[in-house]
Every structure is written in structure tokens, then in C-alpha cells.
């Protein structure tokens, strides 16, 4: 059973206001000029965080990456970047960007994110463009790195390059401010718009929730069911080129039985190379026997070619997210059956 993170977070009352965000940022930077680098281009995921951060600083310098953000939301196309002849690791000002690329809008939302983020960044906001995280240090030594999956490496790069203070989104609201919600592990990462002045944070205490839910199923139904919380799936849209995973992880909490990777043989490979001379029931029985006798670790073995094992929680969470959608299906949890069965069962 996979439960969507939103249900858990809402049940926990894990919310924070923009003023809570501003207070935490102000406490960390003391009204200094702050650089905000590598944010994703998303009204749902980042616009309100930007507003809150802007309220807590004296001046904000926002550094955007080209041609897209970390998860594939494009400011411009790859072709436009190539044709421009610029080095994306150099610094491009807002004026230079508009001169080269006009006023591009997001392919799906129709939003001009440069204009939107400039308006949300407050009166004293500047926007630059560079794929080099350390470019921001020419403007300020105090930085919020807003990237998600590369945040630890980015922070290390900035500190080695001379930054005085670097704070990731996971460091903001990792403790309660003014009795706000918080997430000790992920801070603002995984948050969503709730209202115009409030965000819903990623749920906390998630491992315990999964274990408690499993106990409840056992108590009420007498069955041991693996349980997990899921947010964004880890799949990438082949048309829009957007990677769905804007959360810090696919599954922040799960029971012990969901730890690890699949260990499978490739039926097509075995059918062609091992039992190709057999037909009908003989072929079926031979395949079943091969599956039953497979090694516990098939790494680097030909029979596992093309199976590319991924974490079970990433696979199941992606399956759940694709099933539940992101709109009005009304599916707070997903029931998955027979996932751990194979051809031999």
C-alpha cells in the first residue's frame, strides 16, 4: 500500500507561512545580500518559496541555469543556446539574456519565468544566468543553493570557492519557526503551494508512519502488508523532457520489506540462449526451474542483461505516482498486488 505524501503531511498539519520562511532566512543571513542559485522553474514548487526568501533578505541575486533547470523546465531550447554561441558557464545579465533570446515562455505553462521570478524577488532583485554555481560569488559570498539532487556537491563547491555561508533549501525550516511546521531532514524540499501565503511541507516521521500503518493492517486484517509513502515518481517525459522528481526522494518512508533492489533474470535472453531448443510445456518448466535456481546476486551475469535494477521504492513510488496522477483522480493511496511474484510462482 502506497500513501501519497500530501495526505500524510496534511494529517500532520505540516504547513509553514511565507513569513515563517522569511524569519528563518533572516535569522540565518542577518539582512545581507543573498545569492539564490539553481532554483527550479515552477509556480507550484518554488514561487512561494522565492517570495518568502525575498522577504528575509536585503537584496536578492537570483542565478538561473541554461537552457533549463535541474528537472528539465526550459527557459530556452538547446538549439537556441547552441546558436547563440555563448558559454553557459560564463555570466549573462538579464539585459543580455533578453537581447539574445527575446521573452521566451514555458512550453506548457506559457509563463515567462524570468519575469515572474523577478517580480517575486522583491524590489531589490537582480537576475543573472550561469551554469557555474560559483558565478554567484562575484555578487555575494552568502548563498542559498536551491538545487535538489545535487545540493550537497553544490554546497561543497561554493565553500571551496570562497563562499562565507551556504544554506540549502533542506536547511531552511528544518526546525520550527514561530510554531510552524518543519522537516528535520528536508526542510523546504518537497514543499508545495497550499495558499497564497502558505506552503505544505514534505511529511516528517515517515518511516514510523509506514511501520505504524503496517501494524494497523496486521491488527485489523491479520495480514502483513508492505507500506510506503510516495511523492513524485522518478520518470522523465520523453516529449517535454521534464524529469518528474522535484521531491528530494521518491519515497521518504517505507517498511523493511521494501528495502533493496529487484534480482531478476531476463526472460527473453534466457529463452533465446538457454532453452531455445525447447517448446511448449518443456520450455515453460525449464524456465521455471532456471528462475527458482537463480543466484541471489545476478550482478554482471548475462542472464540479467537489460534488467537494470533500481531501488524497489523508486519503482513502486513511480508506479504509484503514474497511477494516481497529479490532479483530480481522488486517489490518496494505491494498492499494488502481485508485484513480488514472478513466472515461477
Task: Annotate each PLM feature.
Residues 1, 6-345:
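Conserved mixed alpha/beta catalytic, RNA-binding, or beta-rich assembly cores of soluble enzyme
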Amino acid at each position: 500500500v502506497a500513501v501519497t505524501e500530501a495526505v500524510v503531511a496534511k494529517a500532520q498539519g505540516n504547513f509553514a507561512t511565507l513569513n515563517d520562511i522569511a524569519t528563518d532566512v533572516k535569522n540565518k543571513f542577518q539582512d545581507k545580500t543573498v545569492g539564490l542559485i539553481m532554483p527550479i522553474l515552477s509556480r507550484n514548487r518554488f514561487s512561494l518559496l522565492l517570495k518568502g526568501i525575498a522577504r528575509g533578505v536585503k537584496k536578492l541575486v537570483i542565478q538561473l541555469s541554461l537552457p533549463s533547470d535541474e528537472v528539465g523546465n526550459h527557459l530556452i531550447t538547446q538549439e537556441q543556446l547552441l546558436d547563440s554561441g555563448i558559454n553557459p558557464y560564463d555570466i549573462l545579465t538579464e539585459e543580455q539574456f533578453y537581447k539574445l533570446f527575446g521573452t521566451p515562455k514555458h512550453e506548457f505553462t506559457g509563463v515567462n519565468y524570468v519575469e515572474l521570478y523577478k517580480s517575486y524577488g522583491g524590489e531589490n532583485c537582480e537576475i543573472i544566468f550561469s551554469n557555474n554555481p560559483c558565478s554567484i560569488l562575484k555578487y555575494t559570498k552568502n548563498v542559498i543553493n536551491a538545487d535538489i539532487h545535487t545540493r550537497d556537491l553544490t554546497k561543497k563547491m561554493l565553500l571551496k570557492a570562497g563562499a562565507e555561508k551556504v544554506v540549502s533549501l533542506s536547511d531552511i525550516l528544518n526546525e520550527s519557526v514561530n510554531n510552524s511546521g518543519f522537516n528535520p531532514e528536508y526542510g523546504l524540499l518537497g514543499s508545495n503551494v497550499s495558499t497564497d501565503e502558505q506552503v505544505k511541507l514534505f511529511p516528517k516521521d515517515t518511516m514510523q508512519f509506514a511501520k505504524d500503518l503496517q501494524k494497523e493492517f496486521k491488527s485489523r486484517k491479520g495480514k502483513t502488508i508492505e507500506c510506503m509513502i510516495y511523492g513524485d515518481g522518478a520518470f522523465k517525459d520523453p516529449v517535454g523532457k521534464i524529469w518528474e522528481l522535484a521531491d528530494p526522494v521518491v519515497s521518504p518512508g517505507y517498511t523493511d520489506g521494501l528495502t533493496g533492489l529487484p534480482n531478476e533474470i531476463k526472460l527473453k535472453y534466457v529463452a533465446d540462449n538457454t532453452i531455445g531448443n525447447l517448446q511448449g510445456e518443456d520450455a515453460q518448466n525449464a524456465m521455471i526451474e532456471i528462475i527458482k535456481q537463480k543466484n541471489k546476486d545476478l550482478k554482471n551475469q548475462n542472464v540479467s542483461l537489460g534488467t537494470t535494477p533500481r531501488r524497489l521504492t523508486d519503482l513502486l513510488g513511480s508506479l504509484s505516482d503514474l497511477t494516481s496522477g497529479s490532479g483530480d483522480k481522488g486517489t490518496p493511496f494505491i494498492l499494488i498486488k502481485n508485484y513480488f511474484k514472478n513466472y515461477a510462482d
